[in-house]
Each structure stands twice: as C-alpha cells, then as structure tokens.
Amino acid sequence: MEISACVKYVGVNDHQVDLFEGQYKVPNGMSYNSYVILDDKIAVMDTVDGFFTEEWLNNVEQVLDGKMPDYLVIQHMEPDHSASIPAFLKKYPKVTVVSTAKGFQFMEQFFPEFFADQGLPAEQRIVAANDGILELGQHSLHFVYAPMVHWPEVMMTYEATEKILFAADGFGKFGALDAEEEWADEARRYYIGIVGKYGPQVQAVLKKAAGLDIQTICSLHGPVLKENLGFYLKKYDKWSSYQPEESGVVIAYASVYGNTRNAAEYLADVLQEKGQKTVLYDLARCDKAKAVADAFRYDRLVLAGITYNGDLFPCMRSYIEGLTERNYQNRKVAIIENGTWAPMTGKLILGMFEKSKNLTFTETTVSIKSAMNEQNKGEIGKLAEELS
C-alpha cells in the first residue's frame, strides 16, 4: 500500500487470531501495521507480531528494493508491535533503533540478548526526546510522548512534510484491513476495551495534536485515515472525556431461569413505546466488550440482575468491573433486582459504583421476588418514565 510516494505500508493481516489480548473477540481478525519512510535516511516505523515476522520482513525488503534502513523507530513495545525487533536486527545489524528511554528498558526486558549487557551498542541507540526531531532528509520525525496511551513508553511521531501522524495504538480498531466494516463500532470497542481507562492521558495527546497540521493518521491497528479526520478526532475527544455519544438506553441483564430477562424485555418494550432507543444484552451470552462499549456509547444504563450466593451473579459482577475499571461516569443508571428470599442486587450494585464519578441513579429501583407481577410492571412503567 502506498500512502505517498515516500511513505509505504508494510504491515500484515492476521486472520488466525480469535481473541485479541486473550479476551477480545475479533471475528474479522487484526492488522499489525508498520510503515517505511524513504528518504536520504530510511526509517522503518515499528514491527509486527512474531507469528508474521517473515511476511513483514519480506514486505520491508520489497519496499527497500536493495537499500538498507537507517532507523527502526519503536513507538510502542507491546509484543504485537515489537516481537519482530530481534529478527530485524539480525537482518539489518547496522540499523539504529529509536525509542523512548522506557521503550529501551522494555526492550532489555523482552529481548535481553539484544539490548542488555553487551547487546546493541550505544551508538546504535537514539533515545527520542519529547518534542525531539530526527531529520531524514526531506522528511523529519517529530516525537511526541504519549505515556499510558496505553503503555508508559508510548510515543507518537509527526512527519511534517507529509503531515502524517504515526499514532501508535491511537485511532486503532479491531479487524484486518480487508474486512469490510465501518470504522466506528470496532474502533469504539477497541478504544473502550484497551485504552478507555486512560482518558486524561488521551486528552493530553489530543491537545498536542490540535497544534499540528494533520492530513493522514497512521495507526498501528486498522486503516490509514485520510478523509474527514475531524470525525475521528471528535470521536476520540468524546470517548476520552467520558461523554455519551448518543441518546439511548442499554439494558444489561443476568438471568438464570428467565424471570429477570422477562423484566428487562418488558422495560425495553415500554421504553421503545416511548420512542427511546434501547439495546438489550444478555450478559451470560453476549460479547461483554461490546456491552461495555455500548454502555459508554449511550447515556443511560439499566442493570437487571439476580442475587446469587448472597452476591451478584458472576457475569453481572464482571460486567460492572469492566465499567468501573474504565472510569464509567456521566451517565444515568437504573437497577432492577431479583431474589426469591433476599434480594440484594441493588445494594451490591450501588456498592460497586461507590467510587464512580457523576453517576445519577434513578429514584425508582424495581425489586422483584421470584417473578415479575403486576405491581412490578407498574414500577417498571415508573422507571421508564424516569429514563425517558
């Protein structure tokens, strides 16, 4: 793929992976992106997952067309982007590696035979300074530290001539490049799942990016972004500031025998009759990452759960943990609890959100004993009024 006359894509698609990072379902695979900048000095931007080292090296070799690379720039040390560093150094032993100080620390930890003790000599290492510049000829690389987006060593790189932001994992998405799907849904699921905890750090990077003339965004996952960049930047601003994108109600339920599900579905019907958009999730069976992402997408959330062994049902507890560890906030939340002899769900859910910011809980909490009755239906109607 040609990004410009001098900037080439050399990444790979992975259709073997079924769970990214061991937990996120990726039915359309993943891409691990890498780029080559051709100039008086040649820079290779990041590597790829170790399962695809040979394919990546072949891609790089084809673009180099007999030339030797001068720099290997490592923006992010997570193994899906760094695992091919050793093979690259074996093939191009004179290359200079460029990264942050923390990046080199992680290289020593991952690849001690190449970077610790008698490994890569000092003259083949450049510690990139924040706001530092590396001249390639007609192109220059301006390094921008982006700690905790989403690892501490991360930096992004701005190339001023082509006006390209090499964004590390920023603006990435699930899915291989040959997957035909819209960017937003899988980018949201990727962002909320992997980066979502670090909203303030993303906001800091967006402020830095606001001062740059960016015409292309090259992420380490997903497509190269060239058109309507304001759309992507606004999405990231919304996600990282924990503001809802849309008006709608997510109803997430945990049900053993179907009684709590019946209540959740009844509420969904009532809300839809009132013109409210609703999204229903069976937490025992759904893609939890999507259910978490949609809780951030919409402005209202209903949690309908049962008491189980004097506690929350496991999938409900896990779901709420997925929200709180990503700093869920600025939403309205409602609770439907069910228990045959001692409903405790409401109290337990409130306890899990004790440290959360700017959550508003509805005045009505629906408490069901075993199965929904006419009184409960009336309470659900009242709850629907509060949510509308």
Give residue ranges: language-model regions:
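Active-site metal-binding motif and surrounding structural segment of the metallo-beta-lactamase
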Residues: F51-V98
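Short, charged N-terminal beta->alpha structural module
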Residues: A252-K274
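Structural motif
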Residues: K41-A43, Y71, H139, K163-F166, ...
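FMN-binding flavodoxin-like domain, especially the glycine-rich phosphate-binding loop
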Residues: L177-I217, H221-V224, Y266-V279, A291-S388
